[in-house]
Amino acid sequence: GAYLTIMVLLGVFSLFFAWQLKQTYAYGFAAVCGVCFLVSCYPVFFSYGTWPVRPWYVLEVVCLMGVYPLIARLQGKIVKLPQRLIRVETVILSGGMVLAGVFFMFGAGNARFGQIYALLLFLYKTGCALCLLYQAFRAYRNEVCKTPVLLVGTVLFGASLVADRMYPGYEPIYGGWFQEIGLFMLVLSIGYELAKDLA
């Protein structure tokens, strides 16, 4: 509940700043918050009743795959990467949404295809984490970001993806999913960098 509330508030404040102060990064941050909200709505939605898994689970997975290119694009702009590199990263990382869509349209229920999908998903998440870590480390080393907040948030996010693969049977009754916790930390660190620019 608190996670969803924070995402909504961050998204609303971002839209306000984007509109009032013409802060272009704020629109991207609002989109990231909105997609994070959609990803986290799925378990809450299902706690209030019995619903068919399709299309809701598919929507959650596609949104989760969609948040990675959004974050990479936003982080790339914050750390002032070359525009061409940002575009290439965004296109490559958007492949995760295509991968998830293809799996759920054609391969759901096929055990062999499921194994291939799990391997590709692992490689995709590893690539996302490495891409974001490279961007954050480069920004900190080149002093684009004066504090290590973005780097720390990105390291926590990368660690959450590793933990998600190491403990696939983890039941998130108390702590939440590893990915959600890591994503939350990364969103807060990006929000901090954007707020610092506004100050």
Where are these regions (language model features)?
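Short, hydrophobic transmembrane alpha-helix segments
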Residues: 13-24
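Secretory-pathway-linked proteins and extracytosolic
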Residues: 29
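Interfacial "cap-and-anchor" motif at the non-cytosolic start of specific transmembrane alpha-helices
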Residues: 33, 37-199
